[in-house]
């Protein structure tokens, strides 16, 4: 009877130990599953962060491309403005040269007119002197008449030259007025172009600053990408290690579940044996 009681006590203690071990196994399984879930969640978060950073880098690249396009357009516009300015300067130079030539021709015509007028006056004075000295001297009179005719011809030619010079002078004055008007318009256009060039210059400075900032951001993004790439590699390595750990833990879980099942079967066997023993005792 004492032996049976000792056996029952031993079986009861073994049953309690089996229950404790089973509970410990179940807790260990829960801990392993929780660790596995945390690792999977961390891996998913790393994948999301890398995707977001990749999107930010694409956006930065698009902004850099747009800034480069604007800079090229501004440089093209500046080149066109410089070409237009050079053309206007050339036209102004040609107008100034034409004006100088017109002034030289006018000066020459004025000098010739003065010479013709002096010659006509001198001839007229000579004719009067000759007429007063000798009205009977036909030869001298004929000579004087010839000189007078020549003087008149010279005077008429001078008048024609004067009229031609006056006409050319009037045309030159009109051309000069037109040239001055074109010159004023050209100067106004040059001022306007200079203002536009200043604006374009300021825009180019802004674009250069934006380009430098974009370059700095690009360098920063490249550094960030390199860092993220390294972090991704580290995360992949950690994920790979985590997968290996999870695999090991899964194997451990399977082993613990097998042990738990064995303990449950053993517990059931002990319970059945206790029930049988109690039944035998009840029969006594």
Curated annotation (Swiss-Prot):
Gene3D superfamilies: 1.20.5.170, 1.20.5.340. PROSITE patterns: TROPOMYOSIN. Residues 1-284 form a coiled coil. SUPFAM superfamilies: Tropomyosin. InterPro entries: Tropomyosin. Residues 103-131 are annotated as: Disordered. Keywords: Coiled coil, Repeat. Belongs to the tropomyosin family. Tropomyosin, in association with the troponin complex, plays a central role in the calcium dependent regulation of muscle contraction. Homodimer. The molecule is in a coiled coil structure that is formed by 2 polypeptide chains. The sequence exhibits a prominent seven-residues periodicity. This is Tropomyosin-2. It comes from Biomphalaria glabrata.
